[in-house]
């Protein structure tokens, strides 16, 4: 399943100014709203990042309205980088407006690296139907206050990640399993680096399969 119309570029209203957003639509009636969060803005992260683009295309292939957006200070989004605080509020604001636009649809949520941290910080308030975290930067940002997700949750981690401690991710997942929801599904890709060079097809296949199984 793929988009048959050009992506829609929308400027949503945020507390720091516009939130630049790219929206793609599935061929058939949508099953969900799916929001993807990009990696660190100060290191070139934006909605065009290839990893979050891959996650977004997987959401689209599974039948969702796929939404990517630029955090504050990136592209046409207003404001300046806020070390995750303002970015989390931007995500909450964007999802509220998307839900007002498509009130009947559940939310799927995903993020890569810094974006996975932001989406994890917001998920308790957003209550998504499912969650995808790619290379969550455990040890680089504060994960201590993140509530364990209560929805189906896929974590994809390369075991040759040069930026994230792979074992720290595994320990954090073990420590944050909750009886209130299904256990996280950890997929460790052998010989994959932080940006999954040459492995993005595996990321897309994993996300698509997880979403189809979880949203059935």
Where are each of the predicted segments found?
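Post-His helix in hydrolase/transferase enzymes
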Residues: 197-210
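Acidic catalytic loop of the alpha/beta-hydrolase fold
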Residues: 159-164, 194-195
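Gly/Ala-rich beta-loop-alpha elbow adjacent to hydrolase catalytic centers
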Residues: 110-119
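Short, surface-exposed "cap/lid" segments of acyl-processing enzymes
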Residues: 18, 27-68
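N-terminal cap/lid segment of alpha/beta-hydrolase-fold proteins
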Residues: 1-29
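Short beta-strand/loop motif that positions the catalytic acidic residue
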Residues: 149, 153-157, 161
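Alpha/beta-hydrolase active-site loop
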Residues: 51, 81-101
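Catalytic histidine neighborhood in serine/cysteine hydrolases
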Residues: 174-195
